Amino acid sequence: MGYRSFIVQVDDNDQSDRRVTLAAILARLHEAELEGVYVTPAREITPFTSAILPDSVVANRLRDTGEAQARAEQRFRACAAAAHLAAVSWSAPAGPALDAAVLHARRADIVVTGQPLPEDAHAGFAGDLLYGMLMRAGRPLLVVPHFGDFSEVGQNVLIAWKETRESARAVSDALPLLKRAGKVVVMPVSSPGDSDSGGAGSGAGVTAWLARHGIKASVRAEVADEIDVGNLLLSRASDLATDLIVMGAYSRARLAERVVGGVTRLILESMTVPVLMSH
């Protein structure tokens, strides 16, 4: 089964235009619908801030927020039109940003979003939104780097494989993209001293499963010794001219919440090619 609906997170900046263009191209390729979703940054007006701020400040912020939303919609529709995509819709839900984004994400097959810009005024908000969606949406996220041209994605795919639920979910979620790929490499990564050091056998099961779906994949096992797993994956992705990484998104407990794990966070912060992640 292919993708029938895409959602793309839209902002009022050039980085958003690039990911909207990619989302529109993919939606057209898969004959799917595309919905643009704009959520208001957390520092904008809330019931609490509107109660304590002067009326003039509230009015100015509401005006600025409305103008930014209108510009974002205009940019979204222009990018979708340039990609000759007809099945397009727009949403700017009210309420808490993460809750709204998660609810909309669950209505789609896949969500296209962006790597937060470190220097952006809303970088903290964007990071929290991205990590929260990964943990809560129950949908794969295709995360697009903030720099680079990614009008074509999925011709040369690297699967970062572990024998885990998250990895299995990610590979299954990526099937429509993998079926169109020209090259797929499964990369199990182990640590020195593991009983299956090098992971030579750990990729056999998933490659056999992929073969049953008509996808030919090779296995390239790696051992992370003098380099951590995240940097190893990024290095190999560069070596192999990868244009898409597929991997599970991992979490760890911190008090009463779940936060993304170290490898997941490193990839999201340092990625140079789009990454499809599932939790």
Regions found by a protein language model. Name each.
Residues 1, 41, 78-111, 212-245, ...:
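Structural beta-alpha unit
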Residues 1-56, 136, 149, 153-222, ...:
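Small/aliphatic-rich secondary-structure junction motif
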Residues 19, 97, 126, 167-170, ...:
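Amphipathic coiled-coil/heptad-repeat helices and related helical stalk/stem segments
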Residues 20, 25-29, 100-150, 236-279:
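Gly/Ser-rich helix-loop-strand patches that form or flank binding pockets
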Residues 36, 89-92, 143, 186, ...:
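A structural preference for short, hydrophobic beta-strand core positions in alpha/beta folds
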Residues 56-71:
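A short acidic, glycine-rich active-site loop
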